[in-house]
């Protein structure tokens, strides 16, 4: 009996009630691989698995698709070439801020730079553990440059992969928060949630059109039915005109904007070192890291109260028709010492409305001003007579006190505290506490004419001794402080600069303003010495004392070098032997001199300046200068030479040349054949 055609078999299977599927068509596609019936040898598993789905309902005589010439033989299709194994793609992970990390052998690398089609990567633990692991990617190829100094992060990597491989969740509500993995929230008193707004029912036709429109949106952007919509994000104004983001009783200050995303950092980042971050996109908030401190509930309530007061006054002025003076609302609140700004000191929170008299006076004053603003242009003389007395404004009749700084600037003195000038905006001058950098004090002050407004309280007592010293210096300006007749002494530095020598101390030049030259102590970075000096012609004035004794040995060595300059290496003809250079792993080059490695620092004319490779790791201060084939070393090394590393670099330098020779030999052989 002849076999039916494949189309007839499909029709019969459809008549029997079977649905056509992808598995039913596989035997037709894989007809190049045909098994022959053999009772002794079992059928291959791959062919049997392809045919069982389609031949389960067919009779046994239809199992043979093509005539078989030899039993027990599998006929394979001919292949013209061997299928090459495709290269494995690189694996990357996304960072919380939109970047990417390279995953290679359970190590994480962050991108450093890209040159052409090469991308250079360095270990993610480079800053924390000083790991020098490097990698270079070119297409799908990864080249490791150095070994890691720590084990691979297998547990954290598996956790990140599990987090990345989770199925996409339903659409988030507009006010909901997205909490990243590995982030635990700080326990704090939670604010009462707003009551959900009941949704208004829409007709069936509108719901139908709306459902059709929502089907065209991506799954993540479709609103989930039954989800409560929360209130929009809350923002508060800063005292300098910026905005704070309020989220779960924490305050965030704006950092940057990238596209539709706004990045925020915790306001306590500088004070407490808090590393919490937030990203807002529309009404959605994503918190990156947890806070290391509790929220300032009292301060937040004070800021909200201040915001409400500003809005009330603005509404009153708009209702009275004074649209031109709406920008001066905050100025009226800034009269006095603290106004509505809270103090973050010890004890309970106190606002600056403690006196009942000041309350009544401020109210009557705001009412009288709101009535007289419309007549402001015509009655300027009457307005000057209607101004309240200076007692109500907390204005010192003598004005604020200013003192000269040792370097020629100005200090603001208020309540025995010293403030340094920060910026000027219109008639307002903004000041910061002098001890901001040293003690982290966040106190600010604003001066406008004779008015002084303090923003935050100080975290330290006033420096009365330093204040009295500045006042005495102001009363008796010091021609006696200038050292006159002899004149200052100068010495050459090893790199061609100049040192100021005064009372056996060495000073490094900082800047020059007019005929004055400002100098800092040479040991400022090493010992934190804050001594300063100013030279004007032949006069020298020292500002602060040194915190260390003078370096007599170093001073004598500099004087000897000044008297007997070491120019033996530079005199005479150039040496015949060329300098040795080695390639770095990132494409630069090292200078090799007396088995030490130097990294290029700068070039000035024909001279090239080099510094020791181990400057950052070991603090070595050795320097070298090359001019042609001549080398001059400035300081000795504080460590022995790294002979093993030098030999490894030399072997790496020789390896590419050997590979090139092999390639040339192969090309020659092919040309001969």
UniProtKB/Swiss-Prot annotation:
Residues 47-62 have a biased composition (Polar residues). Residues 354-379, 659-673 have a biased composition (Basic residues). One of its GO terms (molecular function) is zinc ion binding. The modification Phosphoserine is found at residues 21, 294, 339. There is a cross-link at residues 110, 666 (Glycyl lysine isopeptide (Lys-Gly) (interchain with G-Cter in SUMO2)). It holds the Pfam family FLYWCH_N. This is FLYWCH-type zinc finger-containing protein 1. Signal peptide: none annotated. Transcription cofactor. Negatively regulates transcription activation by catenin beta-1 CTNNB1, perhaps acting by competing with TCF4 for CTNNB1 binding. May play a role in DNA-damage response signaling. Binds specifically to DNA sequences at peri-centromeric chromatin loci. The keyword tRNA processing does not apply. It comes from Mus musculus (Mouse). One of its GO terms (cellular component) is nuclear body. One of its GO terms (biological process) is DNA damage response. Interacts with CTNNB1 (when unphosphorylated), perhaps preventing interaction of CTNNB1 with TCF4, and thereby regulating transcription activation; phosphorylation of CTNNB1 may inhibit the interaction. The keyword Repeat applies. Residues 1-62, 147-178, 351-402, 646-673 are annotated as: Disordered. A zinc finger (FLYWCH-type) spans 92-150, 235-293, 402-460, 490-548, 581-639.
């Amino acid at each position: 009996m002849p076999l039916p055609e494949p189309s007839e078999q499909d029709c019969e299977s459809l008549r029997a009630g079977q649905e056509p599927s992808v598995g039913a068509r596989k035997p037709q596609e894989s007809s190049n691989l045909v098994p022959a019936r053999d009772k002794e040898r079992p059928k291959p598993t791959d062919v049997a698995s392809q045919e069982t789905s389609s031949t389960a309902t067919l009779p046994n005589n239809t199992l043979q698709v093509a005539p078989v010439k030899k039993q027990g033989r599998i006929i394979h299709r001919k292949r013209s070439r061997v299928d090459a194994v495709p290269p494995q793609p690189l694996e990357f992970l996304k960072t919380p801020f939109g970047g990417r990390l390279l995953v290679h052998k359970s190590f994480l690398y962050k991108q450093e730079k890209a040159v052409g089609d090469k991308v250079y990567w360095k270990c993610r633990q480079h800053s924390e553990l000083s790991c020098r692991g490097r990698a270079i990617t070119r297409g799908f190829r990864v080249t490791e440059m150095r070994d890691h100094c720590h084990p691979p992060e297998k547990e954290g990597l598996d956790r990140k992969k599990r987090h990345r491989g989770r199925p996409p969740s339903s659409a988030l509500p507009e006010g909901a928060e997205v909490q990243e993995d590995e982030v635990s929230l700080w326990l704090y008193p939670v604010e009462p949630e707003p009551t959900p707004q009941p949704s208004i029912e829409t007709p069936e036709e509108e719901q139908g059109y709306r459902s059709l429109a929502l089907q065209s949106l991506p799954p993540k952007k479709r609103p989930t039915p039954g989800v409560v919509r929360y209130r929009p994000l809350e923002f508060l104004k800063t005292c300098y005109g910026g905005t704070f983001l309020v989220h779960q009783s924490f305050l965030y200050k704006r950092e940057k904007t990238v596209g539709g995303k706004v990045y925020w950092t915790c306001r306590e980042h500088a004070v407490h070192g808090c590393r919490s971050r937030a990203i807002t996109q529309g009404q959605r908030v994503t918190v990156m890291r947890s806070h290391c401190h509790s929220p300032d509930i009292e301060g937040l309530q004070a800021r909200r109260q201040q915001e409400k007061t500003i809005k009330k006054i603005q509404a009153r002025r708009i209702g009275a028709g004074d649209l031109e003076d709406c920008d001066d609302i905050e100025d009226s609140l800034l009269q006095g010492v603290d106004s509505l700004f809270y103090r973050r000191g010890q004890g309970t929170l106190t606002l600056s409305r403690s006196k009942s008299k000041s309350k009544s006076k401020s109210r009557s004053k705001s009412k009288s001003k709101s009535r007289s603003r419309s007549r402001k242009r015509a009655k300027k003389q009457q307005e000057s007579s209607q101004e309240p007395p200076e007692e109500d404004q907390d204005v010192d009749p003598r004005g604020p006190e200013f003192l000269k700084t040792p370097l020629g600037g100005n200090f603001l003195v208020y309540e025995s505290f010293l403030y340094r000038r920060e910026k000027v905006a219109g008639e307002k001058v903004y000041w910061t506490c002098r001890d901001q950098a040293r003690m982290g004090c966040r106190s600010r002050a604003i001066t406008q004419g004779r008015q002084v407004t303090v923003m935050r309280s100080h975290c330290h007592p006033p420096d009365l001794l330093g204040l009295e010293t500045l006042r005495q210096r102001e009363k008796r300006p010091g021609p006696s402080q200038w050292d006159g007749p002899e004149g200052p002494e100068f010495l050459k530095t090893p790199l061609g600069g100049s040192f100021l020598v005064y009372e056996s101390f060495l000073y490094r030049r900082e800047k020059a303003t007019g005929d004055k030259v400002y100098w800092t102590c040479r040991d400022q970075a090493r010992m934190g010495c804050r001594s300063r000096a100013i030279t004007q012609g032949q006069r020298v004035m020292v500002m602060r004392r040194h915190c260390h004794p003078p370096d007599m040995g170093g001073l004598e060595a500099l004087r000897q070098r000044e008297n007997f300059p070491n120019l033996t290496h530079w005199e005479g003809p150039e040496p015949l032997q060329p300098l040795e250079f080695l390639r770095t792993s990132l494409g630069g080059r090292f200078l090799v001199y007396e088995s030490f490695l130097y990294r290029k620092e700068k070039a000035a004319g024909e001279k090239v300046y080099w510094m020791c490779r181990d400057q950052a790791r070991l603090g070595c201060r050795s320097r070298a200068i090359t001019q042609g084939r001549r080398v001059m070393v400035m300081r000795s090394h504080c460590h022995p030479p790294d002979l093993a590393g030098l030999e490894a670099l030399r072997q790496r330098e020789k390896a590419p040349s050997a590979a090139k020779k092999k390639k040339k030999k192969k090309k020659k052989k092919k040309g001969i054949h």
